[in-house]
Design a protein with these regions (language model features):
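Rossmann-like NAD(P)(H) cofactor-binding subdomain of soluble oxidoreductases
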Residues: 61-64, 69, 73-142
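NAD(P)+-binding Rossmann beta1-loop-alpha1 motif at the extreme N-terminus of oxidoreductases
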Residues: 1-53, 58-62, 89, 110
Length: 142
């Protein structure tokens, strides 16, 4: 079974993580905030979308290096402005065999680089499989 780690579990990452878990993949969700991680573990409900309930198999952690190293597929669901910092700080946790899927939206403001370009820059072009999944923005009804 494929193992997937989501870096970021906001509304977009959370929805995708739930879907992949329901499709049979082993999913770990990383969030930098331990209080959010504890809420997710304790309630199995998303902190931004209470009607989003995670299956029992989804794991939650704030240990990013362990989450990266234990997975085959890394899905980047963090704000595009945070990608460079997060990847740079955790570069040693990645290996060239990871499949990296970017689902973050936008470009890096300071450089005008796409997330794929930022990843190539930070990871020195050493990763064979870097892809981007894009789609509509999720809007909340008012």
């Amino acid at each position: 079974m494929k193992t997937v780690t989501f870096l970021g579990c906001g509304s977009w990452g959370g929805a995708l993580g739930k879907l992949l878990s329901e499709k049979g993949l082993d999913v770990t969700m990383w969030h930098r905030n331990l209080d959010v991680v504890n809420h997710l573990k304790d309630t199995r409900t998303h902190y931004l979308i209470p009607e989003l309930i995670f299956p029992s198999g989804v794991e939650f952690t704030n240990n990013i290096s362990s989450a990266i190293q234990s997975s085959e597929i890394i899905i980047l669901a963090i704000p595009s402005q945070s990608i460079r910092d997060v990847i740079t700080k955790n570069k040693s946790s990645f290996n060239k065999n990871h499949i990296i899927v970017n689902v973050s939206k936008g470009i890096e403001i300071d450089t005008l680089m796409t997330v794929s370009e930022v990843l190539n820059d930070v990871l020195d072009g050493n990763h064979r499989s870097v892809v981007t999944l894009s789609g509509q923005v999720m809007l909340k009804k008012s």
